[in-house]
Amino acid sequence: MNIPSFPLPSRPNVEIQFRHPVVKETITYCNMEPGSEERHVTEYLNELQTGEKQNSALWTAQDRRTALWWIMVNSRLDNKEAFTYTCSHCNEVHVHDVDLCDLAETVELLTIEPFMRVNVPVAGKPTDWTLKPLDGRGQELLERMRALLPDADSPEYEQSLARLRIAEFALCTSLDDDPESFEAAADRRLELMENMAVETEFSPLVAHIQLMQKSLRHGLLMTFNQGAAQVVLPAHHCEKEGMQMKSTQLFIPFHGRLFIPRFSAGWMANHH
């Protein structure tokens, strides 16, 4: 059974037709390990497409997460979720009950091309860069890099974390003379960035990338850190008497496994 067609937020003229998830998907994706979640998200989004299929690895990270949400809210009977957090205003634990259908109010569709062109020099040589949102291939690569990070108390941790951040910048760009291989091209851009002059080359490029990310905002309202998505929930007001005017904006890790139907433990029970 199909659900309403889904316009890709980055390219609204492209509509994707998904079907309802079925039991075999709850079995296939019942145990997504950290480090492989984005690969499974790609498989899931590709599998649920009907008609002419597109490779969701080429969609933006925002397209992919918004598609997961779209499938879920259009195929579940109850889309209410409870999120607990410690309130910074009263230091008490609150429960924020959210109807995930309400997140539709934050969805934006792009009305311009999903990329920007800038010229920033590399080693003094004028260079044309294409800036674009992170895509599924980049998410998978960053996920593998995150899984290989050393322990936080390791002497190599800060260096590895900085290199991960530069890799994220590299994956939001492309060059006209990129190698055909996605990973080879990403590695080459990473190496170029590591050898850029800090103040006159790299800093301006980062500023352009951050402006691109702000200007090309699309899909659900979310933030990204090291390629990992966080969905922005509606603000929740403090529940303590006299402090109801104060509110907290919640950022919830947008794990794909939370938006893909799971095999219910209750189905395993034998009541005979």
Question: Can you name each region flagged by the protein language model?
Answer:
Residues 1-272:
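Long C-terminal interaction/binding lobes of large macromolecular proteins
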